């Protein structure tokens, strides 16, 4: 049975991603900053007859929490087949000219450094998989090209901190994929689309089912699948790739 760790999986897109991977026969380590919320999510899925999962407390912004999660999962499996770095925060819609630097640091600590922490912590388990997959959940708001295109439908939506954190995540994904280019790894930045979740007060047009399906698609890639790409069905439905 293949295994996957999903961070921020107690609700919304992460939760639905867990459900869809469970339906494909994966064993899921459902990561949640709050263990209580994670346990509640596990019980909901078990009530649907999806039993191959367990909650893992993991705060991606906390070194000790990530290390503890690695120890806990390491007691249960020697191999991790997929890592979905889904946990993220928005930071609201601040002004770059006046927002305290602490807000920038907080968002980057989760959206970028959190991904680095978790990926490094679980790299040894991923390396033991014959088909390791890493999905870094990004956003079209991290695209420099789109933000410079006045015809883009979200051109005026300048997320002053969230956007740069995802741009940085995209570059990290490129470098990680390059470093792992001669291995079986597939590492991609995947935009699930503007989805109706509590992350955006349910303002997005997409559904969590559609968003999760995109993440699952790239978490289960075949050996000939892409790596080091910025993937988005929304921004480039004809190619599946988003402009950087």
PLM features per residue range, with description:
Residues 167, 182, 189-190, 197, ...:
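C-terminal helical subdomain
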Residues 50-52, 72-85, 91-92:
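A glycine-rich helix->loop->beta "capping" turn
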Residues 24-40:
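Conserved glycine-rich Rossmann-like NAD(P)H-binding loop of the short-chain dehydrogenase/reductase
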Residues 35, 56-71, 101:
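The beta1-alpha1 cofactor-binding region of Rossmann-like NAD(H)/NADP(H)-dependent oxidoreductases
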Residues 1-29:
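Canonical Rossmann dinucleotide-binding motif of NAD(H)/NADP(H)-dependent dehydrogenases/reductases
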Residues 84, 118-122, 126, 172-173:
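Hydrophobic positions on the long internal alpha-helix
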Residues 89, 93, 97-108, 127-181:
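Catalytic loop of short-chain dehydrogenase/reductase
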């Amino acid at each position: 049975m293949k295994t996957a760790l999903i961070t921020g999986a107690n609700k919304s897109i992460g939760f639905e991603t867990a459900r869809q991977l469970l339906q494909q026969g994966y064993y899921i380590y459902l990561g949640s900053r709050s263990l209580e919320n994670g346990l509640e999510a596990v019980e909901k899925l078990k009530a649907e007859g999806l039993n191959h999962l367990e909650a893992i407390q993991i705060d991606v912004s906390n070194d000790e929490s990530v290390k503890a999660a690695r120890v806990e999962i390491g007691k249960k499996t020697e191999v991790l087949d997929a890592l979905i770095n889904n946990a993220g925060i928005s930071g609201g819609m601040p002004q770059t000219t006046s927002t305290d630097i602490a807000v920038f640091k907080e968002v980057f600590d989760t959206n970028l450094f959190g991904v680095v922490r978790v990926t490094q912590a679980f790299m040894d388990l991923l390396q033991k998989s014959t088909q390791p997959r890493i999905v870094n959940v990004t956003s079209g708001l991290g695209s420099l090209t789109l933000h410079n295109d006045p015809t883009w439908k979200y051109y005026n939506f300048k997320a002053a901190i969230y956007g740069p954190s995802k741009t940085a995540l995209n570059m990290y994904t490129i470098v990680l994929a390059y470093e792992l280019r001669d291995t079986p790894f597939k590492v991609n930045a995947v935009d699930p689309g503007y989805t109706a979740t509590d992350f955006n007060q349910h303002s997005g047009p997409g559904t969590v089912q559609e968003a999760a399906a995109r993440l699952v698609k790239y978490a289960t890639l075949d050996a000939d699948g892409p790596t080091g790409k910025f993937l988005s069905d929304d921004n480039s439905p004809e190619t599946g790739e988003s402009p950087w």
